[in-house]
């Protein structure tokens, strides 16, 4: 659902930020 997609997007953003 929307919440799941939103959570995935947030997690991806966090991962990319940490791996930057």
UniProtKB/Swiss-Prot annotation:
Reaction catalysed? Release of an N-terminal amino acid, Xaa-|-Yaa-, in which Xaa is preferably Leu, but may be other amino acids including Pro although not Arg or Lys, and Yaa may be Pro. Amino acid amides and methyl esters are also readily hydrolyzed, but rates on arylamides are exceedingly low; an S-substituted L-cysteinylglycine + H2O = an S-substituted L-cysteine + glycine; L-cysteinylglycine + H2O = L-cysteine + glycine; S-benzyl-L-cysteinylglycine + H2O = S-benzyl-L-cysteine + glycine
Superkingdom of source:
Eukaryota
> What EC number(s) has UniProt assigned to this enzyme?
3.4.11.1, 3.4.13.23, 3.4.11.5
Tell me the compartments it is located in. Answer: Cytoplasm
Main subcellular localisation: cytoplasm
This entry's Gene Ontology molecular function terms read: aminopeptidase activity; carboxypeptidase activity; metal ion binding
Q: Which family does it belong to?
A: Belongs to the peptidase M17 family.
How does the annotation summarize its subunit structure? Homohexamer.
Indicate what this protein is called per its UniProt record: Cytosol aminopeptidase
Tell me the gene name. Answer: LAP3
